[in-house]
Amino acid sequence: MAAPISEKMGITTPKDSIDRLPEDPEKVENTETTTDEEVIVPPVNNGETQQRWNESTTNLFRFFSTIYAFILMGMTDGAIGALLPYIERYYSISYTVVSLVFLSPFIGYLLAALLNNLIHHYFGQVGIAVLGPLCRLVGILPLVFHPPYPALPVVLLFTGFGNGIEDSAWNAWVGNMHNANELLGFLHGAYGLGATIGPLIATAMVTKGNLDWWYFYYVMLGLDAVALVLLTGAFWRATAKVYREQFLDATGGKRTTTRTVLKNPITWLLALFLLGYVGAEVSLGGWIVTFMLKVRHVEEFWAGLSVTFFWLGLTVGRVVLGFVTGKMGEKLAISIYLLLSVAMQILYWLVPNFAASVTFATFLGFFLGPLFPAAIVAATKLLPSDYHVSAIGFAAAFGGGGAALFPFAVGAIAQSKGVEVLQPFCLAMLIFILLMWWMLPGGHSRGGLERARENGEKVGDGFRRVGRRVLARSKGAEA
């Protein structure tokens, strides 16, 4: 018996995201006259038909293939920080110039944010499965030939685009499954695992194997070639035709434009939250080694090991706290994790001891771990179901740009002020994303996000409620 189309596509929506908002004037009824900016949206399903990661061999294959893809994405992002001092030394360049290896992928992530839905529409999920690894291969291949430095930022545009479209697509797919908090915890834990072993392998190759920095990318070439085969095989039947047929059957031809999704303030709030979060995470991961060498004055191997412990803490946090977050409620849990992260960041900054620094960095990674998965779950609970693929895809890819933008900013400032600027910079970013999180609709009790959608709460309502209470109490005190 042939598998239903919904099983082939793998995009469903949570039960609490079924109720649709009033019809948007941007909706277009006639599919033949829609423009390229308009994107297919996933069908509306009830909670009983939510996909499970293990409901079929197809889903099992696809889920574990995305896990492997996230491991490679983590290795790519994590290793660059460990190799940064050696790239700087090899090319004899400044902090600002070497930081361009962080900035250039931002353009790739931005393009991924804008094109994610069009790729789904014209090529389906199999298009993502092919383009993601292929773009990473195009970006990595020149690195093994250690070309002149100006070529590095250019080729890394491709890795940014490949990571961006996979990041957005697989987040949207897994984020709409049953037990999304836990599954996204494993998915992003895989990224953390890659970011843990990537620097470890790279550091060992350079410091213990006496190899030049570019030899690490021979390893990545082989691993990404495997990813191309795995993902293409896993999503081979998830074509554009399947994607469009599922949509037309479920919605009668209605489509939601990208412009409409971007007019919703929640989309931008989550995108800014992820931009700041990923920026803080990768700034720490990218500059810890240099910070330990220049400020804590430790040996190269131990400096490389410190970033491994940071990513290890992040990996464990994503997996372990993923089971806690859903039980506490996303709004409360992430608020607690962020406050603890701020405390760890301050201690990491102010305690000038190597062992203490590694300990605080590890716990900082642990509490930062579940933030990205929780933001994806929040999107599925606060936004209409037909916004999910577009909004999550945009927020994830736009947020991924933080991995390029903010580490570059740290490097540019460090050129004149020293790498010590890493700590106050990351502290400011953590406070910023905490404020962004508190601006989301919904209270801090469990189920607050769901009730916020049911009650039609708006962005910043929590701050307004607190302001009214403070004002009322001050008036009462005066009386």
What are these regions (language model features)?
Residues 2-69, 73, 256-260:
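Cytosolic juxtamembrane N-terminal segment immediately preceding the first transmembrane helix
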Residues 80-81, 264-316:
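Extracytoplasmic gate region of multi-pass secondary transporters
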Residues 92, 124, 145-150, 297, ...:
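Helix-breaking motifs and short loop linkers at transmembrane-helix boundaries and internal kinks
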Residues 111-150:
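Conserved MFS/SLC helix-loop-helix module at the cytosolic interface between two early adjacent transmembrane helices
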Residues 112-125, 317-330, 414:
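Helix-to-loop junctions at the C-terminal end of transmembrane segments
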Residues 164-178, 370-384:
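Intracellular juxtamembrane helix-capping segments at the cytosolic ends
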Residues 180, 186-242:
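Helix-loop-helix hairpin linking two adjacent transmembrane segments in secondary transporters
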Residues 328-375:
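C-terminal transmembrane helical hairpin of 12-TM major facilitator-type secondary transporters
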